[in-house]
């Protein structure tokens, strides 16, 4: 066979293979259409079946691939329904990690806000982290001087829980240097306090729209909880303070429905001090554990009924939970009066468990470092010192800060009780470290029916940043 004949033969074989390959593709397409395109019961690809129930809607996405059914259950909350939140707090044995945002570590190279006062609140379908920004980013020149609490640049924003407070996912909520937020089952309500110290104003937003205001009544830094407010059967409650941080101030409970204030009452606590309350629903009432920045190292307790009647006193436990504080052995508890050294404090929390109490506190007695949570037997009703459980969340070699409470609603958790949860702020930068800025990240823990080992979920950012070296 001469060279020309070889070329013709190879070309003919190649052409034949190409034609055969094309025919195979055509046959494959025809078979696919015939198999997947048949009528009758098998023609349900990508159909959605919706079955309605009394309280919620369960959506079943049914996709059939060659006679194999894949069913995905998607929970859906009817947004026309208020959350109940009259259930009791679940009895828990420990607290497991729910989320950690690592905002400062990520912010060394990412577009993350400079923040303080982060807190968590939940709707029937999600939990969100709220935070007060400083109108600046980490590792940027505008972060200089952000140790200041109140400025016209501070805003309340939020992200899905676990996300760092970044510019790409954050949602604006209110102009604020003090704030609270909660969901009634229909929409989010946020309260942002802003303005000059002597004439501050709290703007109530409902569903993202301003609906009401509270003006400063004492002319001395109107402020609110820095943690979740509480909604029960459509009505939402929060606590505000106006007056000195180191002397007698004035305290009020507010009640709103769909973002409009429908009631308020003054709280009388002569010789005591209430601010930055951490509140949660329990057995149809609002229970708050607050900060006494004037007279004691035990925490004020405020229990609010739906009609705005209240009971006020102090956490009975014979262990102090504010910072700074004295030795546990030297502390005498009281259910009615402030006890301990008369110094400033830090925002904290507690949960009632029957007559017991879970109480969070820094490990250090003198500074905002470390964090632990203790269960004190009969500590809600008696001056007991008996610790039945203790769990370390941040070790004493690392900074902590504010802490506060929230609950997982039954609509979200699927339980028949409210899951107690808390968050711990971990402050970095000024005044304790050599930076030009102050910011924080947070760890969030939720109650479980198991004991959880001690560990340190600390912030972990390596400081200083580049901006601090200029």
From Swiss-Prot:
N-glycosylated. Residues 36-470 are virion surface. Residues 1-14 are intravirion. Glycans are attached at residues 46, 54, 84, 144, 293, 398. Disulfide bonds join 90-417, 122-127, 182-229, 231-236, 277-290, 279-288, 316-335, 421-446. Residues 89-470 are annotated as: Head of neuraminidase. Its cofactor is Ca(2+). Homotetramer. The influenza A genome consist of 8 RNA segments. Genetic variation of hemagglutinin and/or neuraminidase genes results in the emergence of new influenza strains. The mechanism of variation can be the result of point mutations or the result of genetic reassortment between segments of two different strains. Belongs to the glycosyl hydrolase 34 family. This is Neuraminidase. It comes from Influenza A virus (strain A/Equine/Jillin/1/1989 H3N8). The lineage of its organism: Viruses, Riboviria, Orthornavirae, Negarnaviricota, Polyploviricotina.
């Amino acid at each position: 066979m001469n060279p020309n004949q070889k070329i013709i033969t190879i070309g003919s074989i190649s052409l034949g293979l190409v034609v055969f390959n094309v025919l195979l593709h055509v046959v494959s397409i025809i078979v696919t259409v015939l198999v997947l395109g048949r009528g009758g019961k098998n023609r349900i690809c990508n159909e959605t079946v919706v079955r309605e129930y009394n309280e919620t809607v369960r959506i079943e996405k049914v996709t059939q691939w060659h006679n194999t059914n894949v069913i995905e259950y998607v929970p859906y909350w009817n947004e026309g329904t208020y959350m109940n939140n009259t259930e009791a707090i679940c009895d828990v044995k420990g607290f497991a990690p729910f989320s950690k945002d690592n905002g400062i570590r990520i912010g060394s190279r990412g577009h993350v806000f400079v923040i303080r006062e982060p807190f968590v609140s939940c709707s029937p379908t999600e939990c969100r982290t709220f935070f007060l920004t400083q109108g600046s980013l980490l590792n940027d020149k505008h972060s200089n001087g952000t140790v200041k609490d109140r400025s016209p640049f501070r805003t309340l924003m939020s992200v899905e829980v676990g996300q760092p407070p970044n510019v790409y996912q954050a949602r604006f909520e209110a102009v604020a240097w003090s704030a609270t937020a909660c969901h009634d089952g229909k929409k989010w309500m946020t309260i942002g306090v802003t303005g000059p110290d002597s004439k501050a104003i709290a703007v109530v937003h409902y569903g993202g729209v301003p609906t009401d205001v509270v003006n400063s009544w004492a002319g001395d830094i109107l402020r609110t909880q820095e943690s979740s407010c509480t909604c029960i059967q459509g009505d939402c409650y929060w606590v505000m303070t106006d007056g000195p941080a180191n002397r007698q101030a004035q305290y009020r409970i507010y009640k709103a429905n769909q973002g409009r204030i429908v009631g308020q009452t003054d709280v009388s606590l002569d010789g005591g001090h209430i601010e930055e309350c951490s509140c949660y629903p329990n057995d149809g009432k609002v229970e708050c554990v607050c900060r006494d920045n004037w007279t004691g190292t035990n925490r004020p307790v405020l229990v609010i009924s739906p009609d705005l009647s209240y009971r006020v006193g102090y956490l009975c436990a014979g262990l102090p939970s504010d910072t700074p504080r004295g030795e546990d052995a030297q502390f005498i508890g009281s259910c009615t009066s402030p006890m301990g050294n008369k110094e400033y404090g830090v925002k904290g929390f507690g949960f009632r468990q029957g007559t017991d109490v879970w109480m969070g506190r820094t490990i250090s007695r003198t500074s905002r470092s470390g964090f632990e949570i203790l269960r004190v037997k009969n500590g809600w009703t008696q001056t007991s010192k008996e610790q039945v459980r203790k769990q370390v969340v941040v070790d004493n070699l690392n900074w902590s800060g504010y802490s506060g409470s929230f609950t997982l609603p039954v609509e979200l958790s699927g339980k028949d009780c409210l899951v107690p949860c808390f968050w711990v702020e971990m402050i970095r930068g000024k005044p304790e470290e050599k930076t030009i800025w102050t910011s924080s990240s947070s760890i969030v823990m939720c109650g479980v029916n198991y004991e959880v080992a001690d560990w340190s979920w600390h912030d972990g950012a390596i400081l200083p940043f580049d901006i601090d070296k200029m």
